Amino acid sequence: MNKKISFIINGRVEIFPESDDLVQSINFGDNSVHLPVLNDSQVKNIIDYNENNELQLHNIINFLYTVGQRWKNEEYSRRRTYIRDLKRYMGYSEEMAKLEANWISMILCSKGGLYDLVKNELGSRHIMDEWLPQDESYIRAFPKGKSVHLLTGNVPLSGVLSILRAILTKNQCIIKTSSTDPFTANALALSFIDVDPHHPVTRSLSVVYWQHQGDISLAKEIMQHADVVVAWGGEDAINWAVKHAPPDIDVMKFGPKKSFCIIDNPVDLVSAATGAAHDVCFYDQQACFSTQNIYYMGSHYEEFKLALIEKLNLYAHILPNTKKDFDEKAAYSLVQKECLFAGLKVEVDVHQRWMVIESNAGVELNQPLGRCVYLHHVDNIEQILPYVRKNKTQTISVFPWEAALKYRDLLALKGAERIVEAGMNNIFRVGGAHDGMRPLQRLVTYISHERPSHYTAKDVAVEIEQTRFLEEDKFLVFVP
């Protein structure tokens, strides 16, 4: 099966080229996706786009809500096509693909959550729309301008989130899709066009693709005109973004991270196992927040292990795995054999839907992902802390939730960036941080308009007449 995906330039779908010389292909097993080769005209149109988005925030959020209502409709053609593409090309199960589409609708339709996102990260939901008085100044946040998003394919929703952040801050979005997921950003942009092809939000979007090998001169030209770059992916992708971005702009890096789960002597073993299994299974451990290790403290360890296996089997039915190709199956088998040879205890599903490897803390051979988890029985939190690493550890899920209150300071000081209840690793709560930052703050420029000299300050209750102060040598008179 072959699929053609056209570029979208400034909210308009480009005509797919007829010549094979102007087309590039991405293979997905027996299937292929064909995309245009980026050309000078497209790059020029992207760079020349200079329409200021003067919409109020409520206009933007209402538009996103309207788009989200379409995604909520299970008969919406874009949604149906998107689900089919995730299954056919990316190997998603029906349940996984449907859940991805459901989350897109949830995010777009959560008007309150979008308002709160802006308020929490920028300080006020009005700060993008008007000048706000703050002490002795007025302040307003303006968009950086051209935001270039280098997306990854392991977590489709990360691309949606990246785009929405730029839209909420009124930036132009130049989206470079991933070779492993050329579908999500394209489907989202097409749904904007369906609602209103002339809407400023629609017109601010461009969705393209380029390879990092070969001639990247046009890609470099786009990068050199960026006002901010949002880079997702592995070390190579992050390094490429840093290398080709202008030296004076901000590169927001969402690079590779690891996450794990702490189970602290639970009373409810079933709930503990359910939460841990969810955090292992969601996205088949492809996400930075996915649990790859479980540290169990307390008694009833064997009972917990059996409950965990039971819940991994449950998730194999309610959220079936992505299809493994030949190499992935071989890697799974190899890790199993390596661990057995090393004397570790291994439980593995006959269909490779999950694997549990028991080892001491710090003993970890290879990690094939795909719902493979290392289970460590430890005595106390001190045996876990060495495996929390700054800039490397993202999410630590904890059960019971109350146990996190005991450990959160220790975990944070060691470098943990996010602490959640087990079973909640995929839901980024409003008000929280992402990889140690507030991303919206880095997508805007804060401009201050400061009050005039006759405005008296709290500590200096006279007009600020600096020339007179110098002439009369009275500066120290006004020092509080």
UniProtKB/Swiss-Prot annotation:
Pathway: Lipid metabolism; fatty acid reduction for biolumincescence. One of its GO terms (biological process) is bioluminescence. InterPro entries: Ald_DH/histidinol_DH, Ald_DH_C, Ald_DH_N, CoA_reduct_LuxC. It comes from the Bacteria. Its EC number is 1.2.1.50. It catalyses: a long-chain fatty aldehyde + NADP(+) + CoA = a long-chain fatty acyl-CoA + NADPH + H(+). The keyword Ubl conjugation does not apply. Transmembrane segments: none annotated. Signal peptide: none annotated. It is an enzyme of class 1 (oxidoreductase). Disulfide bonds: none annotated. It holds the Pfam family LuxC. Belongs to the LuxC family. This is Long-chain acyl-protein thioester reductase. The gene is luxC.
